[in-house]
C-alpha cells in the first residue's frame, strides 16, 4: 500500500508538470494587510492570511501572487512603493484583489486615511491603474474582528476577561468605502466582513476562537508565552475564510469559476494547506468519518512513505494539477 500510493503521487506529479507548461496562467495579485498576507513558517508558526491559503482552491491555470503585508494601509502600501511593484507586473487578463481598512483606521499619519475621502481615493487609484494595464480589480472590505465585548462595554479592546454574547463591529465606515467605490466604478465587490461576521456569529463565542490566534502558553515554539489575538487567522481559519472568498468569487467574478477546485484537505510545503505531509492528511481523512476523501498534494518534495489502513478511503493522492 505504501509503495502504490507513492508511485501514484510521483506519476501524477510528472504528468502535471507536463500539463502546466502548455498554458500561460492567469495571475491573481493580492494587495492588503496582515489578514490577507503570507506568514512566516518559522518555529511552527500557525498564523495564516486568507490570501496565503487561496492557491489550494484554484487549478494550476491560476497563480496567486500575494503582496499583502502586515501593518499596511492603502496609504502606506502606496507610499512604500509596494503598489508600483505590483503594477509593473500586471498583464492583460490578470486580477488584483484589494483589501484594506484594518490599518487605514489607525491614527498614525503614515497609515491613516478617511472613509469617504482619502481611503476612497486610494481605492479608486488601485482600480484605475489596474484597468489601465488590462487587469481586473476586485474590491473586498475587511474581515471581521472577533470582538465579543461584555454587556455594557463600549470600549473596543483586543480581548476581554469575560466575553459577551454579541459580535460587535469595529470597522465602521471603513467597511463602506470599498462597497461605495465598487458601485461607483462597476467593480466586483465581495462583502468579506459580512461573510466572516456571519461565520463567527454562527460558530458562537467559544467555537469561533478556533479560527483565530488563540494560543495556550507552552504549546508552540514560535509563541511559547501564548496569546489571544482576535484579528489574525490560524491555519484552520485561513482555509475557511479563503473558502468563503472562493464561494463569493463564483458569483461575483464568474470568469474565475472554471478554475476553482475543492478538496477536503490540502498538503503543501509552502504553508498554503492544512498539512505539510501527506501522512498527516491521510491520518485526518481516516479519522474524519467520510468514506470518500479528496486530498490535494501541491508541488514540493515529499520524502515520506504513506501508510493507511486497507479500504479506509476510496480515493487519495490528487496532485496540484490532477
Predicted regions span which residues?
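Serine-esterase "nucleophile elbow" of acetyl-processing enzymes
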Residues: 19-68, 84-96
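Bacterial N-terminal signal peptides
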Residues: 7-16
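Bacterial N-terminal signal peptides that target proteins for export
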Residues: 1-7
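Active-site-proximal beta-strand/loop segments in catalytic clefts of secreted hydrolases
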Residues: 31-34, 66-72, 98-103, 140-144, ...
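Beta-solenoid repeat scaffold
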Residues: 288-296, 303-322
Amino acid at each position: 500500500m505504501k509503495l502504490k500510493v507513492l508511485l501514484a503521487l510521483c506519476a501524477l506529479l510528472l504528468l502535471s508538470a507536463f500539463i502546466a507548461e502548455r498554458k500561460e496562467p492567469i495571475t491573481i495579485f493580492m494587495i492588503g494587510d496582515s489578514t490577507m498576507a503570507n506568514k512566516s513558517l518559522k518555529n511552527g508558526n500557525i498564523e495564516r492570511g486568507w490570501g496565503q491559503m487561496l492557491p489550494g482552491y484554484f487549478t494550476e491555470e491560476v497563480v496567486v501572487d500575494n503582496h499583502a503585508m502586515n501593518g499596511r494601509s492603502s496609504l502606506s502600501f502606496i507610499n512604500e512603493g509596494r503598489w508600483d511593484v505590483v503594477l509593473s507586473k500586471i498583464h492583460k487578463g490578470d486580477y488584483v484583489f484589494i483589501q484594506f481598512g484594518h490599518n487605514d483606521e489607525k491614527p498614525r499619519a503614515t497609515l491613516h486615511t478617511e472613509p469617504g475621502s482619502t481611503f476612497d481615493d486610494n481605492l479608486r487609484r488601485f482600480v484605475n491603474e489596474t484597468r489601465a494595464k488590462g487587469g481586473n480589480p476586485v474590491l473586498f472590505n475587511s474581515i471581521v474582528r472577533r470582538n465579543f465585548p461584555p454587556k455594557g462595554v463600549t470600549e473596543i479592546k483586543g480581548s476581554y476577561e469575560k466575553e459577551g454574547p454579541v459580535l460587535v463591529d469595529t470597522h465602521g465606515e471603513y467597511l463602506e468605502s470599498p462597497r461605495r467605490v465598487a458601485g461607483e466604478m462597476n467593480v466586483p465587490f465581495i462583502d468579506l466582513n459580512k461573510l466572516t461576521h456571519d461565520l463567527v456569529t454562527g460558530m458562537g463565542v467559544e467555537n469561533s476562537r478556533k479560527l483565530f490566534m488563540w494560543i495556550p502558553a507552552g504549546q508552540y515554539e514560535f509563541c511559547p508565552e501564548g496569546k489571544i489575538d482576535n484579528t489574525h487567522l490560524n491555519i484552520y481559519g485561513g482555509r475557511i475564510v479563503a473558502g468563503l472568498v472562493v464561494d463569493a468569487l463564483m458569483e461575483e467574478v464568474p470568469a474565475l469559476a472554471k478554475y476553482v477546485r475543492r478538496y477536503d484537505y490540502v498538503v503543501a510545503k509552502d504553508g498554503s494547506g492544512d498539512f505539510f505531509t501527506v501522512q498527516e492528511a491521510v491520518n485526518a481523512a481516516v479519522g474524519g468519518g467520510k468514506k470518500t476523501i479528496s486530498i490535494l498534494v501541491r508541488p514540493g518534495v515529499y520524502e515520506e512513505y504513506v501508510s493507511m489502513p486497507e479500504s479506509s478511503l476510496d480515493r487519495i493522492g490528487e496532485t496540484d494539477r490532477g
